[in-house]
């Protein structure tokens, strides 16, 4: 991912402790004990206005407590598997105002459930 700033625990910088600015790509650690903290942080940074747009690459564990909050965002359920560790498929989550653009781009790789207006949703699959 082409980014201006990287946060990595290996480098001693936790993204949970930093303010996120502008456009953010998040691939959080998938441990059960911490993943909810990362989801909460993403929603907080977006709602505060610090992060304009956030894309989260995460496993599609729709049966988990932390995933329930993601239904408030636009989602792309990737068709097929991205070769990561683990048995789940992948979901890209979008927090931002460009839901139509997210749907246009990400429907090329999976089925997108995007917010339209209010509580309305649109489903688009090109694959």
Predicted regions and their residues:
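Class I S-adenosyl-L-methionine-dependent methyltransferase catalytic core
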Residues: 1-127
């Amino acid at each position: 991912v082409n980014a201006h700033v990287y946060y990595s625990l290996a480098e001693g910088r936790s993204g949970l402790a930093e303010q996120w600015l502008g456009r953010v790509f998040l691939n959080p650690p998938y441990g059960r004990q911490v993943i909810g903290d990362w989801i909460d942080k993403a929603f907080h940074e977006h709602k505060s206005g610090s992060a304009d747009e956030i894309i989260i690459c995460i496993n599609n564990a729709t049966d988990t407590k932390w995933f329930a909050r993601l239904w408030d965002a636009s989602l792309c359920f990737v068709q097929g598997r991205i070769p990561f560790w683990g048995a789940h498929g992948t979901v890209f989550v979008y927090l931002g105002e460009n839901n139509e653009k997210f749907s246009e781009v990400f429907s090329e790789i999976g089925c997108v459930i995007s917010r339209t207006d209010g509580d309305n949703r649109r489903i688009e699959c090109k694959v």
